[in-house]
């Protein structure tokens, strides 16, 4: 099974755009690091920067909900893309996001259910529906 999960910080606000066919696409980068004890002192160790791509409702909800610097959990699959730059073939590996959300270890979050169109429902509507 090709599934990967990351916990890290978003390096910039997600960028939302739409394909010619109307599908929502959001891209963002997650910086992953951990703390390691070296010579008796704790140090931050950078594990890498991971490009993430979300589609459709996940893309729209991520763009509305996530901001630069937030700590998030990302679940998805590794995808290798090939493209050309000035006639030279290049490859990149990115995470095709299936799930993303805030890491609640050091933060809190308010969750609002999305409507069928992908936009957040108002809290008044949720209260009327018994949410």
Question: Where in this protein do the model-derived segments appear?
Answer:
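A short hydrophobic beta-strand segment most commonly corresponding to one strand
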Residues: 92-102
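Core FKBP-type peptidyl-prolyl cis-trans isomerase
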Residues: 4-46, 82, 91
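Beta-strand/loop nucleic-acid-binding surfaces
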Residues: 47-57
């Amino acid at each position: 099974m090709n599934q990967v999960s990351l916990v890290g910080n978003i390096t910039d606000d997600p960028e939302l755009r739409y394909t010619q066919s109307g599908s929502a696409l959001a891209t963002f980068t997650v910086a992953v690091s951990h703390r390691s004890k070296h010579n008796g002192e704790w140090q931050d160790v950078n594990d890498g920067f991971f490009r993430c791509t979300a589609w459709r409702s996940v893309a729209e909800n991520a763009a509305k909900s996530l901001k630069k610097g937030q700590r998030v959990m990302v679940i998805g699959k590794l995808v290798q893309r090939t493209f050309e730059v000035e006639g030279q073939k290049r490859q990149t590996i990115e995470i095709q996001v299936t799930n993303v959300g805030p890491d609640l270890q050091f933060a809190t979050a308010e969750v609002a259910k999305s409507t069928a169109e992908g936009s957040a429902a108002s809290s008044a509507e949720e209260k009327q529906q018994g949410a």
